[in-house]
Amino acid sequence: MPLKVLASLLSFLLLLASCANSDLQRADLATIVKVVDGDTVVVKIQNKIETLRLIGVDTPETVHPTKGVECFGPQASGFTKTVLKPGITVKLLRDIEPRDRYQRLLVYLFLPDGKFFNQMLVEQGFARTLNIAPNSAFSELLASHESSARNRRVGLWLSCER
């Protein structure tokens, strides 16, 4: 097994083990249908089309009806579209609260190689953390990666001064 695949698999298993005592729900496999924006994706899951909202992250807006296009929004959406291509199969983990007020399914998303996509968005500066209880299984991990991205001034932390 190539070293990169083994490392990704080990990372995924460590993430799952770190949440062994949490209230994470079952994992589902889903097929990407389309990307709406940086943190919202449409998938096919169990022969049903669902809109997903990634837990613990908030990318700058590109399609919000009142906020317009925010700084680094197009880049965040572009990154998500590049990684989450239609047709790929991903693994979804749910936390305690299954849906948001817009009835989007709230998930942590893992790529076919085991990489944690929510984390990738934060560590590469495409998203800020957004901790909304009770869905906080990975909040400390994501906060740590946000701090690192800020310190390294990558992505929105370089381009968008608040």
What name fits each language-model region?
Residues P2-R162:
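Small beta-barrel nucleic-acid-binding modules, primarily SNase/OB-fold domains
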